[in-house]
Amino acid sequence: MRKLGIDYGDSRVGLAISDELGITAQGLETVHHNGNDKLVLKRLEEILAQYEIDTFIIGMPINMDGSRTERVQVTQNFIHKLRCKFPKIPVETIDERLTTVAAHKTMNYLNIHKDKKKEIVDTISAVYILETYMNKQKNQK
């Protein structure tokens, strides 16, 4: 079974998927939704038809001092929709602090053109979210 990492944003959602053993994460895609969560849920339904996903991992936007951002409530609203649409698939959250910073550093290191960065930053962030979750799970064993 695989895990699906989700970087939820106002207009784009980055998606990453684990391998079946839960060892590696790879970027899947960025879904452009412009506030229409139905588009995201429909795409997730298609992904679930293609892959055996056993857990959704969503990045929670926490401030550096540990306080909650205003985006936390928006993300929690999406999580509620996700749980209603896919009640059999558990949703886990993970602190996503610095994932976007790490994604930008990765893209700079790889010399990715600035026009392309906007298209893939959310997917790369989703990879970091998923990797963070999987590493945490590994360390708890």
Regions found by a protein language model. Name each.
Residues 2-3, 11-141:
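Phosphate- and other anionic-substrate recognition elements at nucleic-acid/protein interfaces
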Residues 7:
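Conserved catalytic-loop position in the HRD/HxD motif
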